[in-house]
Amino acid sequence: MELSSSNCILSAFFAILVLGKQRGQKMTPNKEDYLKCIYEIGTRQGKITNKEIAQHMQVSPPAVTEMMKKMLAEELLIKDKKAGYLLTDLGLQLVSDLYRKHRLIEVFLVQKLGYTTDEIHQEAEILEHTVSERFVAGLEKMLDFPETCPHGGTIPAKHQLLKEKYHQTLASVQEPGNYLIRRVHDDFELLAYLEKHNLNIDQEINFLQYDNYSQLYQLDVDGRAIQVSPMIAQQIYVEKL
C-alpha cells in the first residue's frame, strides 16, 4: 500500500528525529532554556539578574545561582556590573542555533501539519532539544529555506548569529497612523490573545492613541476597536506605513 505524501513527510520527520543530537558542546535542554531566557530578557530590558531569570524560568533562586555558576565556568556567559549576565560569542551562537531549530520546526508544523500559530510554540519547544543538525538542514531544504517563522521572527542561516529585522515595538510608537504587525514574541499566552482578537503577522492596524488614564493603546483594526495593554504592546513589533 502506498503512503500519502503527508504520511511520507511524517515518516521522514520521525525517522530522522530518532537519530538524536550531534553536538560538540555538552548541552542539556535545561541549559538551553536558560540561554534562551537570558537572551530574551536582554532584548526587553536592561540588567539581567538572578531574580529576573528565576521569575522568567519559574524556578527557585538557588537553582538559578547553581546554573549561572556552571554557565560562567563553561564560558557561555560573562558577568557585568551594569548589565548583569551577558552571553559570550559562544553563548550567542548556541542561542542562534536554538532559534534556528525552533523556528524551522514552527514553519514545518504550520505548512506541513496544519497547526495554527498559537499551537506551535510548545511543540517546537520540545522538539528543538531533540533534533540533530542533519535533521535541521534537511528540514530547511524541504521548506525551501524560509527566512521568517510564523511569528515574524528571523530564521538565522547555519552558523550565523540571530539578527531580528524588526525592532520597533507598539509600545514605543508615538505617532498615530497605520502600521503593519511584523513580529510578535513567541509566548503562549500572547499568541492565544492575538488569535482571540484576530491580530496576525503582516496585518495593518491603525494606532489612534495611548490613553494615559486607562494606560491602554487604542487601535482600530478593520473597523474593530481594540485596546492593548503595555505588557502586550511591548511584545508586538510594527513597521510604519
Question: What label would you give each PLM region?
Answer:
Residues 83-102:
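Basic, amphipathic "hinge/linker" alpha-helix immediately C-terminal to the N-terminal HTH DNA-binding motif
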Residues 73-80:
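A short, conserved structural fragment
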Residues 68-69:
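Short, hydrophobic-biased segments on the C-terminal half of alpha helices
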Residues 62, 118:
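Key DNA-contact positions within bacterial/archaeal DNA-binding proteins
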Residues 55, 72-73:
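Alpha-helical residues within the helix-turn-helix
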Residues 44-52:
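Short acidic, hydrophobic short linear motifs in intrinsically disordered regions
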Residues 128-234:
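Mid-protein regulatory/catalytic core that forms ligand/cofactor-binding pockets
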